[in-house]
């Protein structure tokens, strides 16, 4: 247990940021899964709109520092390839 005031504050801040990061990652995974379900169902119109949402979630999480920007770019590229392969 922390005794110093600044250490106590860091614990609180870390817990808050960890919760925020978990929330963002969870939303990101949900967006990607929704897109992949639409691709499996071969629903191109729905998949196109869900791709935009997934790409937005990836960009947002990368800009917030939750995931690495290269990881976000790689995932977006793979999702776009899946979308284009549906044609």
From Swiss-Prot:
User: MF terms per GO, please?
Assistant: small ribosomal subunit rRNA binding; structural constituent of ribosome
- Domain of life the protein comes from: Bacteria
Cite the Pfam families for this sequence.
Ribosomal_S20p
Signal peptide positions (record) = none
Give me any GO biological process, just one: translation
* InterPro entries membership: Ribosomal_bS20 (IPR002583), Ribosomal_bS20_sf (IPR036510)
Q: Which Gene3D superfamilies match?
A: Ribosomal protein S20
Task: Kindly list the GO CC terms recorded for this protein.
Answer: cytosol; small ribosomal subunit
User: What keywords would UniProt list here?
Assistant: Ribonucleoprotein, Ribosomal protein, RNA-binding, rRNA-binding
Recorded family membership: Belongs to the bacterial ribosomal protein bS20 family.
Q: Which HAMAP family match?
A: Ribosomal_bS20
- Which PANTHER family does UniProt cross-reference here? 30S RIBOSOMAL PROTEIN S20, SMALL RIBOSOMAL SUBUNIT PROTEIN BS20C
Protein's job: Binds directly to 16S ribosomal RNA.
What name goes with this protein?
Small ribosomal subunit protein bS20
Query: Highest lineage ranks of the organism?
Result: Bacteria, Bacillati, Bacillota, Clostridia, Eubacteriales
Q: Which gene encodes it?
A: rpsT
